[in-house]
Amino acid sequence: MTFNYDVIVVGAGHAGCEAAAAAANLGSKTLLITMDMNKIAQMSCNPAVGGIAKGQIVREIDALGGYMGIVTDQTAIQFRMLNRSKGPAMWSPRAQSDRARFIDCWRGILENMPNLSIWQDMVQELIIEHGQVCGVRTGMNVVFRAGAVVLTNGTFLNGLLHIGRTQIRGGRIAEPAATGLTEQLISLGIQTDRMKTGTPVRIDGRSVHFDEMEEQPGENDFHKFSYMDTSHRKLKQLSCWTTFTNEACHDILREGLPDSPLYNGQIKSIGPRYCPSIETKIVTFADKTQHQLFLEPEGEATQEYYLNGFSSSLPLDIQLRALQAIPAFRDVQIYRPGYAIEYDFFDPTQLRHNLETKQIRNLFFAGQINGTTGYEEAGGQGLVAGINAHINCHGGQPFILGRDEAYIGVLIDDLVTKGVDEPYRMFTSRAEYRILLRQDDADMRLTEKSYQMGLAKQDRYDLLREKKESRDAIIRFAETYSVKPQYINSGLEKLGTAPLSHGCKLFDVVLRPQTTLENLADLVPALRAELDKVPASRKEEIIEAAEILIKYSGYIKREQIIADKINRLENIRIKGKFDYNSIQSLSTEARQKLTRIDPDTIAQASRIPGISPSDINILLVLLGR
């Protein structure tokens, strides 16, 4: 049988869910194909969303009309704002989620979404006609035709699990690998390679001595992931727990190194640099006598815990004995061991910025198959791929986010311009404009753009306008209201800041590190009256947004000037204007890389590793610049 759709999304992980939802919400008749409907949006590793830079991506997904933030708020069992000791540009939200409820919540959203159908099956073949993807064929020999296909296969393409010397074919533990697609794509000229990731043991909480661990409770303030006016902290809030490995534990781990797939030659692919296995830690940091571990709850209705910091592919008996050498885990029982997994990925420099492959029209890649790691990075790519798959079917300009607009823009530009030689994880340090890309203002940066193309709906846009009007009113008040020393100095001294020598605008007082709008409102009744005008349900969020803009106004303006200068180079298009191999004045490396990556603009060309300033100057001269 044959069925017809506009967009087909293959794989229902975090990238696939966002891709399918975006395409369907924009009006495309969409099909989401997954091997197991009970594993939709499965949190394959830790049951947490967000973290450094990752939390900003989730806020951006939400601001654009995606669902990861909403689902996380609905299922969070602990919330924390990381990096509070640093400036707001570095603040990053993170939440522990109830793993089972996270799946149920996502499935409920997708099953009730207009324009979206779900099919349980394995895709084994793409239908390609005249250099363009036209559909897929499944393991049941069902043909689905479509104008665009988004592949979001995660770790399932020829996945191979390792536990000691035991090897198991699969995409996750006890789940089959996906076969056929990689081989077909190779035959079509797509370059592929292998990567590795891993996950820790899952522990039975009934066997843990919690009284010998340090408790880490969450925070219960107004912060959340979604900008929508939805409830959060709905579930019972649970603590995480910390402890440390010790020398006895390390000695047992060293015993197992001859059987470690990482050290006996079984695994040849590269794993994530910033999430090393416990065996890698004891080898790389041999002088360390302990490593911190975090025990994270999997949900409010289960005894299952995730042991963050103990990722391993060592034999089962070594993992268990090493854990039992730690006092809090001396009686530990586990639900399953840690394991490593190798899987196929595709060189992302074969993609355009809209995540469409250069070789095959209307075929999009998103998520871990592009060489990234993390739910958030996958979700951001999936959203962009789903939007652009819809655009390819119905017409319009590609949806591309700039490096000064979103961490998602930084992520995709890094992938398609620089490529990857190890699993890519987002950090704030990767963004040159991180003061512009704060977690508090993703809605201000992105929701208008999404609303104009029809993805963000009216209720989201109305909340944005309300927030902006209230925020800007506070800032205007601070810019125009004058304060006099005789009325405020005694209060300023109590706050630990110098008294005024003369009158000034309230804005200048807010700039001081010791002051906030709230503590100044206790000294300035007119400011209190202004703050009381803010909608009560979002009062803290809006006041915080106004305060950040005031305190960082100078830095924000300076960074925006730099971004505007760089964006002039983004406007100089070079795609299709050069036969790079014929430009002998370019270095050999430059000719090869420019030909392979085929950058759209001078700015993108300048970010390709190995392209020198002199190479860029040659191109500018040839353009008459």
Curated annotation (Swiss-Prot):
The molecular function terms in GO held by this entry are: flavin adenine dinucleotide binding
Residues annotated to bind NAD(+): 271-285
GO BP annotation list: tRNA methylation; tRNA wobble uridine modification
Give the GO cellular component terms, alphabetically.
Answer: cytosol
Q: Which cofactor does it need?
A: FAD
Q: Where does FAD bind?
A: 11-16
Q: Which InterPro entries match?
A: FAD/NAD-bd_sf, GIDA_C_N, MnmG, MnmG-rel, MnmG-rel_CS, MnmG_C, MnmG_C_subdom, MnmG_C_subdom_sf
Q: Where in the cell is it found?
A: Cytoplasm
State the PROSITE patterns in the record.
GIDA_1, GIDA_2
Q: Which UniProt keywords apply?
A: Cytoplasm, FAD, Flavoprotein, NAD, tRNA processing
Q: One matching Pfam family, short form? A: GIDA
Keyword Flavoprotein in record: yes
Q: Does this entry carry the keyword Amino-acid biosynthesis?
A: no
Please give the HAMAP family that the UniProt record associates with this protein: MnmG_GidA
Would you identify the family this protein belongs to, as annotated?
Belongs to the MnmG family.
Role this protein plays: NAD-binding protein involved in the addition of a carboxymethylaminomethyl (cmnm) group at the wobble position (U34) of certain tRNAs, forming tRNA-cmnm(5)s(2)U34.
Describe its partners and assembly state: Homodimer. Heterotetramer of two MnmE and two MnmG subunits.
Query: What name appears for this protein in its UniProt entry?
Result: tRNA uridine 5-carboxymethylaminomethyl modification enzyme MnmG
Recorded source organism is Parabacteroides distasonis (strain ATCC 8503 / DSM 20701 / CIP 104284 / JCM 5825 / NCTC 11152)
Q: Which gene underlies this protein?
A: mnmG
